[in-house]
Amino acid sequence: YAHRGVCLEGADSLENVLDFIDWLPKNGFNAFFLQFKKPDIFFERWYSHENNPTLSPERLERRDLDAMDRAVYRAMALRGLVCHRVGHGWTAGVLGDTGTGWHVSGSSIPAELAPLAALVGGKRDYWKGIPANTNLCYSNEQARELLTDQVVDYARQHPEADYLHFWLADEYNNVCTCESCQKTTVSDQYVEILNLLDEKLTRAGLPTKIVFLLYQELLYAPKKAAIRNPERFCLMFAPISRTFEGSYPLDFRPVEVAPYVRNQMRLPETVEENLTHLKAWQKVFSGDGFFYDYPLGRAHYGDLGYMKIARVIYDDIHALKTFGVNGYMSCQELRAMSPTGFPDYVMAQALTDERIPFEALRDTYFSAMFGPGWEEAVAFLERLSALSDTDYWNNHGPRFQPALADRYRHITLLAEEFRTRIPLAQKEVWRKNWEYLDFHCRYTMLLAGALERLSMGDQEEADRRFENFCDFIRREEPQRQSRLDVYRVIEVATKYTGFSMPR
């Protein structure tokens, strides 16, 4: 596949990012995506130690962040990686913000810029205080001009960007409700703005490829507008709300999807609903495209063995040819390697050679990782995965699920028992990985215990156990930093799964 990439997410030190970039081409990836105009927020999360008060925060100045951005690009260029940039943040720039993350603004939109913002809930202001999540009034000509001028200026100043992602605001049910905007759809407006952007880039003599996004409201295909110059653009299908308890099918027929109602959208959870939206878009755009998916962005924390999510990734990638796309980019934490890095390994290998059986990848990876006795490690991780539920972790379905509580109790017992059977390996690399698996058993016992009470409807005890889990991983983070993103697991657990933020 032409597109084999990873997008920066989570909380990251500069060393984390540089190590990951070094690893990418060695494993068959060819692209890396730096979100926002500058990827400030991902560095800020780590150096401020957000969600881990046991570590002392480090202040970053603008010059520090700029130096990190340059260092990352130099590392990419050295290895010949395709450079993707920006995505969200353009709308924030029009409204007077830097557009370098999902930061909460301490003020309202400046009065002179307020008419450019979407009218939502009877007012034109930052959506829930976050500029990057704030749409514009796309029927406003000045808003369209400023938005596209900003992209052209960035493309001119950043010739290193092979692909520039032009997305609207993040979040959903936050589009403009003014009379003019309601005469059309946000997807039609998006396509017209893409055409305007192409005209401006052409006049400026800029060859930059533009990636456009099928995501949330924009999953719905336009009703009238069409892209006039397909060669400029690359379609990116981003089914962020999909289930990860199943994979994309090799044989697919569209299904009925709910009609779009402005600012009353229910995000589609089934694979079939999401793919039906993709098929509708492909009727109006037949150019280059790739899947932008999230197995290692949130759902993976719900798979305590990482074996089920690895299999989903493998099968998803083998289904890409069914949908006529040219690759895959993973929106993920870079430190998604707890208990193992097997899912990322599977992703890379499947994208470069689809002939390799999953079982061959498994045996090669784990025999190298654990040495003698690796089969026991695999059997344990597979049992954890079989009992885990990524949908529950991602807040799909009710929180009260007694049958699931039984599975979490079983997980706790499995982890407790397996700790007694961890061998003392001969080689240091094997010993380190077995020791990490011992850590993961303790991690699993604490988290599964909290999930067991949550799925029984006992919120108070669930939160108490979750706080114990957080205390444990916060204390352990200095030793586990390269493999476990403490910031992100706590953020997802409290934003989606249903736990309360611990002290």
Where are these regions (language model features)?
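Aromatic-lined carbohydrate-binding surfaces of glycoside hydrolases
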Residues: 3-270, 274-278, 282-285, 289-317, ...
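Histidine-centered catalytic/metal-binding microenvironments
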Residues: 394-503
